[in-house]
Regions:
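Hydrophobic alpha-helical transmembrane segments of multipass membrane transporters and ion channels
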Residues: 23-28, 365-377, 397, 401, ...
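Short helix-terminus and kink motifs of transmembrane alpha helices
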Residues: 44, 48, 67, 386, ...
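Hydrophobic, glycine/alanine-rich multi-pass transmembrane helices and their short helix-loop junctions
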Residues: 380-385, 402-419, 469-520
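Interfacial helix-loop-helix hairpins and adjacent transmembrane helices
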Residues: 1-26, 448-449, 454, 458, ...
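Helix-loop junctions and hydrophobic alpha-helical segments within the transmembrane domains
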Residues: 353, 360, 364, 439, ...
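Helix-loop junctions at the membrane interface of multi-pass solute transporters
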Residues: 316-320, 440-450, 483, 520-522
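Hydrophobic transmembrane alpha-helices and their membrane-interface caps
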Residues: 37-41, 376-444, 484, 502
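Membrane-proximal extracytoplasmic
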Residues: 2-375, 416, 491
Length: 551
């Protein structure tokens, strides 16, 4: 029988090869190293990414009422955009002088191809666009546009510092955009700086000046001309020449004309105000009792008092698609801390009002901790039921399976998120089944002592081969239908449908390679030890208990 098994069974040939060589040890080391690398390199997110391409079409119709915009532009545009392959919904808003049409594609559609299809459809039907339409614009909307970091700048200075906060925020965001994998970013709150000119009609009339004269004078005195470049030290410097304004004082010093040999400046006929632009929104930050627990960046000044309110400017930072939210957030905060005290004054308080990178990292680390506790629990239970050596053999399958599964996640573009780790926790109780059956049957054959240790191991593995393979693929097939879930739940549950079958398949491979190798190395010394008689199934305690229950 043994000779036939050795000659005919492919499984036995594989088991013999991995048991008698160093391939299993090599497989063990490579899988653990690859898993450690994948754990560090795979992007971390709080939830799986759901790709739902949405295109916003902005249409300008100057002078048209909301009803005219709806009849002439919005309704025909909705009909046209619904004809695009892959479009699921079309929404629209009509306002006086403008319309916004949102085109939502099916979940999983490619963002770039959806953008191209939308633009091509509009370009191919320009003859249907009413002459009253002055301009249209297509802008894609994606999940990565949601900011992962919000930095709020506030100051205890009086209200006049609101514009200064915006100026600091604009300079800071220009530096933060240099961080790798920083995507869309913008500033919210605090009106931007604007130099306003308020001409005095009486003085203009006395000087025989008009508003176009002022516009022409400003245009002539604010010119930047490109005159060439200079290359030195591997840098190319752009040379510009011409008069230009650096501050409000220079704007006021603009010469309008000469009257009686005396120069007439802009400040003589107009009021120049270096202040804020027209404000259509106000942003403030209030500090409550938990002010001492809030996260700040590089703050050395006393914290605000509970109940205090301040003007605020907020910097919103989003990440690029597929990048690691944790590393992007850490780099943004690190650079911000370096700039505190130089670009950012000491009296400006930087508060981290959102940090999805830290949130994702905390939740992933928390699940990893629970996963480690689950692995430890299984090892203890196996040690109590099978024995220490047997539990050690079975426990090898857990880190190896998870390591290679994480590597597959990295290679196939999946991220480490809550659903991914939940899939690993779910598969934990399933993936040890094959090694347990393997070790238990090898242990039984070593007790029977009918064959030499190596041959007994091969016979034991071959005996449980059909049910092990069948049971593993039965579990795999039960998770395959999750690949066909439609809608937003499809990509959300995709890590579950991917990770559990991969983990089960790897546990089967390990049961036929590493588990026999470890069993042969660790259990061979116990072959026949402590057993004076051949193992008798009917005399075992378990057999008698089951027999009594069935009777």
């Amino acid at each position: 029988m043994s000779a036939d098994i050795k000659k005919d069974s492919l499984t036995v040939a594989i088991v013999r090869l991995f048991t008698t060589s160093h391939l299993s040890l090599l497989f063990l080391l490579i899988s653990l190293l690859a898993g450690a690398a994948a754990l560090l390199l795979t992007p971390r997110e709080e939830d799986p990414q759901i790709i739902v391409p949405v295109m916003d079409v902005f249409v300008q119709v100057p002078g048209a009422s909301a009803g005219e915009v709806e009849q002439q532009v919005t309704t025909p545009l909705e009909v046209l955009l619904r004809q695009i392959q892959g479009v699921e919904y079309v929404y629209s808003v009509s306002r006086p002088g403008e319309a916004v049409v949102a085109v939502r594609y099916l979940v999983g559609e490619n963002l770039e191809s959806s953008l191209i299809k939308t633009r091509d459809k509009l370009q191919a039907n320009q003859d249907m666009i009413p002459p009253s339409v002055s301009n249209w614009l297509v802008k894609p909307v994606e999940i990565d546009d949601v900011p992962i970091v919000l930095l709020s700048l506030s100051s205890s200075q009086p209200n006049g510092e609101a514009t200064a906060l915006r100026r600091i925020a604009d300079e800071l965001i220009a530096r933060l955009r240099e961080v790798d994998n920083v995507g869309k970013s913008w500033v919210v709150g605090s009106a931007p700086r604007r130099v306003s000119i308020y001409p005095d009609p009486a003085k203009l009339e006395a000087a025989a000046l008009t508003l176009p004269d002022i516009q022409q004078a400003l245009a002539q005195n604010n010119i930047n001309l490109h005159v060439g470049t200079v290359t030195a030290a591997n840098k190319q410097l752009v040379l510009e020449a011409g008069p230009s304004f650096d501050d409000a004082r220079q704007v006021g010093a603009t010469v309008l004309k000469s009257v009686g040999g005396r120069l007439l400046h802009l400040r003589d006929v107009a009021q120049i105000i270096d202040g804020a632009a027209d404000v259509d929104e106000y942003t403030r930050i209030g500090f409550g009792p938990a002010v001492t627990a809030m996260q700040t960046v590089g703050n050395n000044a006393p914290l605000p008092m509970a109940g205090e309110e301040r003007y605020m400017a907020t910097i919103a930072i989003a990440k690029r698609r597929g990048s690691n939210a944790v590393s992007v957030a850490e780099q943004v905060l690190a650079l911000t801390k370096q700039l505190k005290g130089t670009l950012i004054p000491d009296d400006v308080l930087l508060t981290v009002t959102r940090n999805y990178g830290a949130t994702a990292d905390h939740k992933v680390n928390e699940l990893v901790m629970h996963l480690s506790l689950a692995i430890l629990t299984i090892i203890v239970l196996l040690a109590l039921s099978l024995g220490f050596k047997e539990s050690l053999i079975v426990s090898l399958a857990v880190p190896m399976t998870f390591a290679v599964t994480l590597l597959c996640d990295y290679l196939f573009g999946y991220t480490i998120n809550r659903v991914t780790l939940f899939a690993l926790i779910l598969s934990l109780g399933l993936l040890v089944d094959d090694p347990i059956v393997d070790v238990e049957n090898i242990h039984r054959h070593y007790q029977m002592r009918k064959e030499p240790p190596l041959q007994a191991l091969l016979t034991a593995v071959n005996e449980i081969r059909p049910p092990t393979i069948l049971a593993t693929f039965a579990v795999i097939m039960s998770f395959v239908p999750m690949f066909f879930i439609t809608g937003m739940m499809g990509p959300y549950m995709a890590p579950m449908a991917f990770n559990v079958p991969i983990a089960m398949l790897l546990s089967l491979v390990i049961a036929f390679t590493v588990t026999p190798w470890a069993s042969y190395r660790l259990l061979k010394g116990d072959y026949g030890k402590g057993h004076d008689t051949v193992f008798d199934l009917k005399a075992s305690r378990g057999f008698k208990i089951y027999q009594a229950l069935l009777a």
